[in-house]
């Protein structure tokens, strides 16, 4: 633990916690502080100008990151007939109906995303207590309950990320890996922020994108100067 503590302390010493850095410098600091042996994810936290306690200000959605996430995603699909065949052709790893539901009930959750055709919700609805706590429950707001299951599979495989504001009014998302070029990370961040702006609640007043910070899996957060994002 001592080595970890020293590394964290050294990383923090490189960064002024109250300073807002241009995006290029912020990413450089984050990558420089990411010293884990694995390819750490690069994450972003966005403080929104909303009241997360109000039901009409819950920000939720999804976006396909143009440069992907750097992660291989396993997709399960509830569909039948032509839609099941289309899902398989699109690259779904598991496709089924009652048989897939039984796998879920048995605890076989070897997938990262669950997609469902609307006509299968009578089955999927019974799995809420299992899928819900794991963030796997299909939802039309994030495009995982849809008649076009094939496109949803393609989106998931292409690097779609889901986002939902937490109780503190913050969105947390992954925008890539340490190994990504800065241009890829910036394009992914831009796509995420664009999706957040489009999802802005009508009742939200004042500054909407209040603060943005980037970090690596094992690293510290670096605040981003928003003006540099449009430069």
From Swiss-Prot:
Return the GO cellular component terms, semicolon-separated: cytosolic large ribosomal subunit
Specify whether S-adenosyl-L-methionine is a keyword of the entry.
no
Q: How does it associate, per the subunit comment?
A: Part of the 50S ribosomal subunit.
Q: PROSITE patterns annotated for this entry? A: RIBOSOMAL_L1
- This one is known as Large ribosomal subunit protein uL1
Which NCBIfam families does the record match to this protein?
rplA_bact (TIGR01169)
The answer, when asked if Transmembrane is one of the entry's keywords, is: no
Q: Which UniProt keywords apply?
A: Repressor, Ribonucleoprotein, Ribosomal protein, RNA-binding, rRNA-binding, Translation regulation, tRNA-binding
Q: Which InterPro entries match?
A: Ribosom_uL1_bac-type (IPR005878), Ribosomal_uL1 (IPR002143), Ribosomal_uL1-like (IPR023674), Ribosomal_uL1/biogenesis (IPR028364), Ribosomal_uL1_3-a/b-sand (IPR016095), Ribosomal_uL1_CS (IPR023673)
Give the superkingdom in one word: Bacteria
One term of GO molecular function? rRNA binding
Q: Which PANTHER family match?
A: 54S RIBOSOMAL PROTEIN L1, MITOCHONDRIAL, LARGE RIBOSOMAL SUBUNIT PROTEIN UL1M
Say what the protein does: Binds directly to 23S rRNA. The L1 stalk is quite mobile in the ribosome, and is involved in E site tRNA release. Protein L1 is also a translational repressor protein, it controls the translation of the L11 operon by binding to its mRNA.
According to its UniProt entry, the protein's GO biological process terms are:
regulation of translation; translation
**Phylogenetic classification of the source organism:** Bacteria, Pseudomonadati, Pseudomonadota, Betaproteobacteria, Burkholderiales
Gene that specifies this protein: rplA
Q: Which family does it belong to?
A: Belongs to the universal ribosomal protein uL1 family.
């Amino acid at each position: 633990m001592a080595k970890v503590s020293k590394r964290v302390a050294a990383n923090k010493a490189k960064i002024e916690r109250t300073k807002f850095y241009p995006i290029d410098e912020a990413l450089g600091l984050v990558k420089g502080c990411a010293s884990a042996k694995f390819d750490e994810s690069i994450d972003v936290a966005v403080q929104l100008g909303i009241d997360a306690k109000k039901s009409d200000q819950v920000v939720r959605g999804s976006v396909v990151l143009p440069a992907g996430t750097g992660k291989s995603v396993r997709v399960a699909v509830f569909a039948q007939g032509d839609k099941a065949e289309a899902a398989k052709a699109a690259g779904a790893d598991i496709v089924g109906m009652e048989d897939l539901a039984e796998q879920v009930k048995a605890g076989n959750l070897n997938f990262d995303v669950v997609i469902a055709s609307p006509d299968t919700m009578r089955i999927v609805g019974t799995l809420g207590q299992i899928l819900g706590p794991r963030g796997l429950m299909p939802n039309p707001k994030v495009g995982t309950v849809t008649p076009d299951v094939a496109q949803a599979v393609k989106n998931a495989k292409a690097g779609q990320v889901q986002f939902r504001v937490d109780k503190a009014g913050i969105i947390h998302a992954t925008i890539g890996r340490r190994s990504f070029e800065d241009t890829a990370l910036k394009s992914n961040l831009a796509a995420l922020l664009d999706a957040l702006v489009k999802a802005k609640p009508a009742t939200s007043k004042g500054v909407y994108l209040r603060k943005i910070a980037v970090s690596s899996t094992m690293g510290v957060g670096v605040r981003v100067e928003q003006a540099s994002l449009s430069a």
